[in-house]
Amino acid sequence: MILLTIFWDTLLDILPIAAIIFGFQYIVIRKRIQRLPQVLAGFFMVWVGLSLFLVGLEQALFPMGELMASQLTNTDFLPAVEQGVQRHWADYYWVYLFAFAIGASTTIAEPSLIAVSIKAGEISGGTINPFMLRIAVALGMAFGITLGTWRIVMGWPLQWFVFAAYCLVIIQTLRSPKSIIPLAFDSGGVTTSTITVPIIAALGLGLAASIPGRSALMDGFGMIALACLFPIITVMGYAQIAQWKDKRKQTTPHLSYSKAPPPSKGDNNAL
C-alpha cells in the first residue's frame, strides 16, 4: 500500500513537468517531438526510478542515518564522564569522523557532480581536471558537514557560521580566477542532490535528537546550507592554488650556466 502511494504521489509530481514541456513544444514552438516513443519511455523510467528511490530513502537511508547518529552519541559508546559533569565537545570525535567520511564518499558518488565535472573538463579543453574538481568539491562537502555536526554539538546559532562562510566566499570571489567562479558556485548546488541530501538530513536530525538540550527543529536542520557553501570555498581555493603554482613556474628564474674558462696555455719555455 505504501509503495502504491509513493508511485501515485511521484506521478502527480512528474505530470506538471511533462505538461509544461509538451505544452511549450506543441503550443509555443509548434513542432513535433522527434523520437516521441523514446521520450515517453524516458519519462516512464524517471517515474519508476524516482518512486523506487523514495522507497529506498524511507527504508534505508533515513533510518540508517538516524541510527548511526544515535549509536555514535550513545552514552555507552562515548567516553565515560562523572555524573553531573557536562560532556566535552571533543568526546564526539567519532561523530565528526563519520560526518567527514560520509560527506566525502557520498559526494564523490554524486551523479550530478560527475556529469558537471566531465562537462567542465570538456569545455575547458583539459584545463580543469574532472577528478581533481570532484576531490575539491568532496573535501568542501566533508568540511561543511563536519562543521555542521560540531555546531549541533555546541548548540551555536547557524547564522554565525553562514555569515562567516559567506564573508570568506566574497573574499575568495574577489581574488579567484574569473573563469572558475561560476563553476565554483554551481558546484555547491550539484552536491546537494539525490544521494547526499537524505543522508545529511537524517544525520542532522538524528544527532539533534540524541544530544541533550538540542531541538530537532532548531538544530537538526541547517547542515545542508553549510554543505552548499563549503564546496564553493574549496573549489575556488583549488583554483587559487593552481593559479599560484602556474605563476610560480613562470617566474622561476632559469639557472644560467657560465661557460667553463678555456684551458690555460702551457709555458712554451718549459721544455
Curated annotation (Swiss-Prot):
Entry keywords, A to Z: Antiport, Cell membrane, Ion transport, Membrane, Potassium, Potassium transport, Sodium, Sodium transport, Transmembrane, Transmembrane helix, Transport
Disulfide bonds: none
Keyword Lipoprotein found: no
GO BP: potassium ion transport; sodium ion transport
Disordered: annotated span: 252-271
InterPro entries tied to this protein: NaLiK_antip_UmpB, UmpAB
Name of one Pfam family that matches: DUF1538
Molecular function (Gene Ontology), one example: antiporter activity
Localization in the cell: Cell membrane
Function: Part of a two-component antiporter that catalyzes the efflux of Na(+), Li(+) and K(+) in exchange for external protons. Shows a preference for Na(+), followed by K(+) and Li(+).
Official protein name in the record: Na(+), Li(+), K(+)/H(+) antiporter subunit B
Lineage: Bacteria, Pseudomonadati, Pseudomonadota, Gammaproteobacteria, Oceanospirillales
